[in-house]
Amino acid sequence: MTTPTLIVTPPSPPAPSYSANRVPQPSLMDKIKKIAAIASLILIGTIGFLALLGHLVGFLIAPQITIVLLALFITSLAGNALYLQKTANLHLYQDLQREVGSLKEINFMLSVLQKEFLHLSKEFATTSKDLSAVSQDFYSCLQGFRDNYKGFESLLDEYKNSTEEMRKLFSQEIIADLKSSVASLREEIRFLTPLAEEVRRLAHNRESLTAAIEELKTIRDSLRDEIGQLSQLSRTLTSQIALQRKESSDLCSQIRETLSSPRKSASPSTKSS
């Protein structure tokens, strides 16, 4: 029997700091638009009532007052539409920021589990040659996890640098896929934490090491499947971003062609006149 070794408990995850991923404060122009939208919400009832009265008696008394009231009513509706457009984009950005924070917390928890499994692999290496081979397999599997999450971090950095494209490109289906991936990863972590405690207990009992090795191999296969799914998800996200960029460039070229075509058609008509 090997001497039991003390395992240091992992540190608690750091409190999420929102200094780096802070939601941008609205500018002066956004505040002015918000105030204008609120004012239009207050005035829309009175203006609508006055517009109805203007339709009834305006053409008999003063048609100019009717035209002014209708213009004010249309202006208030345009301000409300602009305010709703601004707030919808901001809510979508805040939802994406929350998903990014949850992915970072999961990355930290996986790094803590990586340290725990590395320590357990060193303990198993002292018991038998078979356990040393299993610890090497775990180490390679965890290295694959690290490489995969490095790719995720680089992808998240790219999303931060292109926030405007994220607001346009990301749809509710992609956000739902991210939420499902986060939920599956949390379930895996909840399953791995009690399993680590069970492995520590089984380290002192050589008769049950074979069963523990089989369980660890099955978990290793499931982790590899999760890595493949995450890699496939990152590929689909990258392909969707490239496709949306190509479509936006094609749309810009079509707009330029449509803007230039009226000028070309107008120039021969001026020459003939």
UniProtKB/Swiss-Prot annotation:
Localization of this protein: Secreted; Host vacuole, Host pathogen-containing vacuole, Host pathogen-containing vacuole membrane
Q: Which UniProt keywords apply?
A: Coiled coil, Host membrane, Membrane, Secreted, Transmembrane, Transmembrane helix, Virulence
Question: Transmembrane stretches, by residue range?
Answer: 41-61, 64-84
Q: Which domain of life is it from?
A: Bacteria
GO CC annotations, alphabetized: extracellular region; host cell membrane; pathogen-containing vacuole membrane
Specify the protein's topology with respect to the membrane. Answer: Multi-pass membrane protein
Coiled coil, from the record: 170-233
Where is the segment annotated Disordered? 1-20, 254-273
What is its biological role?
Chlamydia replicate within a host intracellular vacuole, termed an inclusion. IncA is probably involved in the homotypic fusion of inclusions.
**Assembly information from the UniProt record:** Forms homooligomers.
Domain observations: IncA proteins share the same general organization: a short N-terminal domain, a large bilobed hydrophobic domain, and a C-terminal cytoplasmic domain.
Q: Which family does it belong to?
A: Belongs to the IncA family.
Protein's UniProt name: Inclusion membrane protein A
What does UniProt list as this organism's lineage? Bacteria, Pseudomonadati, Chlamydiota, Chlamydiia, Chlamydiales
